[in-house]
Curated annotation (Swiss-Prot):
Family from the record: Belongs to the WhiA family.
Keyword Endoplasmic reticulum set for record: no
Superkingdom of source: Bacteria
GO molecular function, one term: DNA binding
Species this chain originates from: Staphylococcus aureus (strain NCTC 8325 / PS 47)
Pfam family name, one: HTH_WhiA
Record's protein name: Probable cell division protein WhiA
Keyword Cell division: yes
Residue range(s) of DNA binding per entry: 274-308
PANTHER family with a match to the protein in the record: CELL DIVISION PROTEIN WHIA-RELATED (PTHR37307:SF1)
Task of the protein: Involved in cell division and chromosome segregation.
InterPro entries reported for this sequence: Homing_endonucl, Sporu_reg_WhiA_N_dom, Sporulation_regulator_WhiA, Sporulation_regulator_WhiA_C, WhiA_LAGLIDADG_dom
Amino acid sequence: MSFASEMKNELTRIDVDEMNAKAELSALIRMNGALSLSNQQFVINVQTENATTARRIYSLIKRVFNVEVEILVRKKMKLKKNNIYICRTKMKAKEILDELGILKDGIFTHEIDHSMIQDDEMRRSYLRGAFLAGGSVNNPETSSYHLEIFSQNESHAEGLTKLMNSYELNAKHLERKKGSITYLKEAEKISDFLSLIGGYQALLKFEDVRIVRDMRNSVNRLVNCETANLNKTVSAAMKQVESIKLIDKEIGIENLPDRLREIARIRVEHQEISLKELGEMVSTGPISKSGVNHRLRKLNDLADKIRNGEQIEL
C-alpha cells in the first residue's frame, strides 16, 4: 500500500460529529460527485478509486441524511485497471446538495460555501474531505516532498489554496490540462497539513523519514566538504614536494636557510600530513599554520624562479 493510501485509510477512520461530517462530505461530493436524472428522479453519484474512501462516503451520507446508499464497483478500462467505486443515492438528492452548499437556487457552485467552513474544526474537515477526494502525497522515502489536491474547477482550487493558507501553509495552485492543483512543496508545511486534517500516524512516519533523510544529507554534505578539503590539501602538498625536489636538484636543499631547509625536509618525508601537523614537527618549537604556509610559499616562489630561469638569491 502506498504512503498516500495508508494516509487515506487512516483519515477515513476519524470520528466526526454531524457538522464536521457535512463539511467533509461537501468537499467529497463537490470534487468527485455528479448529479444525474434517472426515471424523472435526481441521482447523486460520487466516484473514487479508493475503497476506504468509498466506505467513508457511504457511511457519512447514510448517517447524516438517513438515506439509502449503494456502492457500485466498476473496472477501469485504461492502462491502470483499478476498481472504480461509485456511491449512489436516489433519495433527497437535491436536498443533500442544497444542505452541503453545493447547489444554490438550483445552480451548481464551484466556490467553497461559507456555511461548510464556519469554524476551525469544519475547515479541517473540509480539507480532509478534499484530500480524500483528490489528494496525493509522495512517499517521503523515495522522492521529493510533494503533496497536492486536484480540483476539476479552478475557482475551487483557488478556494482550497486560500483555505490552506489561512493556516500559513504556503500553498500554491496551478492549472493543469483537465483541472487545477493546489500543492505544497515544503516538508514542514506538509507535516503541518497532515496534522491539520488528523493524519497523525502518517505524520509520525513522514517525520521519521524526514529526520533520517535530513541526517543523511547532512552527513553527505560533510563528507563531500571534507573530501574536497582533503583533495585540496593533497594537491597543495604534491605541488610543494615537486617544488622542493626541483630546488634540491638545482641548488641543493642543504644550501637553503635553516628555517626553509627544515620545513622542506619535513614536507618531503611527510607528504600526507596537514600544515598544522607540519608546524608541530619543527625542531625549534611548534609554529602556526600561517607560519608553515609562509615558508612553503617561499619554497614555491623559489622553484618558480628556477623554472623561469631567474637569478636566485638565498
